[in-house]
């Protein structure tokens, strides 16, 4: 495999090309991309954890340093002003020398407010991309050039197509996340609490809570019925029944996003349902190919959910087609089949149909689907079906003409297990699908 430095060199060539195209389209001279700034908690001198501007880390793997600036014009070597204060109160990152610094002109910026003297004098035709518009105005950037929608739509649209460098980083993120999942499973088997399982995960991945790309979902038993459960009980439950872990990792700013569900005992109905959801997830992935709408795979999985509801006698005396048509599968899988993945966990432009930002909303029947694009080579997507036992979604079905088809006794017996989600991260290639997660033997 090519070195990361060689892959990064080609990555910058691609970003420069996109920059030339977008600047020509909007008749601009350059883009000034801001890493962001620390924001203090209200009435306090303590800042929130820093989260870098995703458009900044698309160019450079600098994710922990505020007050940095990139100037790119698609022609000249990108310039990075790297914040390097004299500060004995806080840790100061040294001026980077790494695999990527040959491609970037790195300049020390000793004072956060010193960027004004470093920039070209004529700034009326420079666009600002970043989270602090008032800073851009103070630098003389025109108001209509601050986060211009057309420019951002263009950049977001093409972020769906990962470079080889980006794919290499995402494969590395997978490795960390898989290590974490294995450690968390061992912690679950030893009877640990959600809090302690999370600690085991973070230790195995080498991440802090603020480093992971999203808040880990560490859900024992019925907590797995809360789709984004992040509470972390300190005390282990009296009886371990199930464990759902939705947790990722980050490498050079790129995310992994994996989910697994385990039963405490391998011979009950819930364990058999996990196996079947897993099998159907893999079967769906095996059918995927470039040129197909992502919506189609979401709809297909509802057909697979119907098959499982029938097989496990959770819904009875109704055809699978009728279950989907009448949305009896809806309360069991209320979320979408997945989403784009990259610099952000829910990566951008999932609804964009072209580089002008044309929006195609999710179908009204499935409003929580996060992607409506045609899948194409170099896209990275999650495939994360689930079956859940969520009373607030099931309750409306307990009355009315369809109630008799729900096997309420069996459904209620499943509720203490919470739910199931299985999530892999896949790369679309011209004639194949690469399952980064399963390639690392995460069962």
From Swiss-Prot:
What does the record's cofactor remark say about binding? Binds 2 manganese ions per subunit.
Which residues take part in binding Mn(2+) 2?
Answer: 246, 257, 423
The GO cellular component terms are: cytosol
One of the entry's Gene Ontology molecular-function terms is: proline dipeptidase activity
EC number(s) per entry? 3.4.13.9
Q: Name one GO biological process term.
A: proteolysis
The record's annotation in CDD domains points to: Prolidase
Q: Which cysteines are cross-linked by disulfides?
A: none
Q: Where does Mn(2+) 1 bind?
A: 257, 339, 384, 423
Tell me the protein family, please. Answer: Belongs to the peptidase M24B family. Bacterial-type prolidase subfamily.
| HAMAP family in UniProt | X_Pro_dipeptid
The name of this protein is Xaa-Pro dipeptidase
């Amino acid at each position: 495999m090519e070195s990361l430095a060689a892959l990064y060199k080609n990555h910058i060539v691609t970003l420069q090309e996109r920059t030339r195209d977008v600047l020509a389209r909007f008749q601009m001279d350059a883009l000034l991309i801001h890493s962001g700034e620390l924001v203090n908690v209200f009435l306090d001198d303590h800042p929130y954890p820093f989260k870098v501007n995703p458009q900044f880390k698309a160019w450079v793997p600098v994710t922990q340093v505020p007050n940095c600036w990139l100037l790119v014009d698609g022609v000249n070597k990108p310039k990075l002003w790297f914040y390097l204060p004299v500060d004995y109160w806080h840790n100061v990152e040294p001026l980077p020398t790494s695999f990527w610094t040959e491609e970037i002109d790195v300049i020390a910026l000793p004072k956060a407010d010193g960027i004004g003297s470093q920039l070209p004098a004529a700034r009326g035709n420079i666009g600002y991309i970043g989270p602090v518009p008032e800073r851009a105005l103070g630098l003389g950037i025109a108001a209509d050039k601050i986060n211009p929608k057309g420019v951002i739509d263009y950049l977001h649209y093409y972020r769906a197509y990962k470079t080889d460098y980006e794919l290499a980083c995402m494969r590395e993120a997978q490795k960390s996340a898989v290590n974490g999942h294995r450690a968390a499973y061992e912690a679950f088997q030893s009877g640990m609490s959600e809090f302690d399982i999370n600690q085991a995960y973070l230790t195995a991945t080498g991440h802090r809570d603020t480093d992971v790309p999203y808040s880990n979902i560490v859900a024992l038993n019925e907590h797995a019925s809360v789709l984004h459960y992040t509470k972390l009980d300190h005390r282990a439950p009296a009886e371990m029944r199930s464990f759902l872990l939705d947790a990722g990792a980050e490498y050079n700013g790129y995310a992994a996003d994996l989910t697994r569900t385990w039963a405490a005992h391998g011979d009950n109905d819930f364990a058999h349902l996990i196996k079947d959801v897993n099998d159907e997830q893999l079967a769906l992935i095996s059918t995927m190919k470039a040129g197909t709408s992502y919506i189609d795979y979401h709809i297909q999985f509802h057909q697979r959910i119907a098959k499982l509801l029938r097989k496990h006698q959770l819904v009875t005396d109704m055809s699978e087609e009728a279950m989907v048509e009448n949305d009896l599968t809806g309360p069991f899988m209320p979320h979408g089949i997945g989403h784009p993945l990259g610099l952000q966990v829910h990566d951008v432009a999932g609804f964009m149909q072209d580089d002008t930002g044309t929006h195609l909303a999710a179908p009204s029947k499935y409003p929580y689907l996060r992607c409506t694009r045609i899948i194409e080579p170099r896209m990275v997507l999650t495939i994360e079906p689930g079956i859940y036992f969520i009373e607030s979604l099931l309750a409306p079905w307990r009355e009315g003409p369809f109630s008799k088809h729900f096997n309420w006794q069996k459904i209620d017996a499943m509720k203490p297990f919470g739910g199931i989600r299985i999530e892999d991260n896949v790369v679309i290639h011209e004639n194949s699908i690469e399952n980064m997660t399963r390639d690392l033997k995460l069962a």
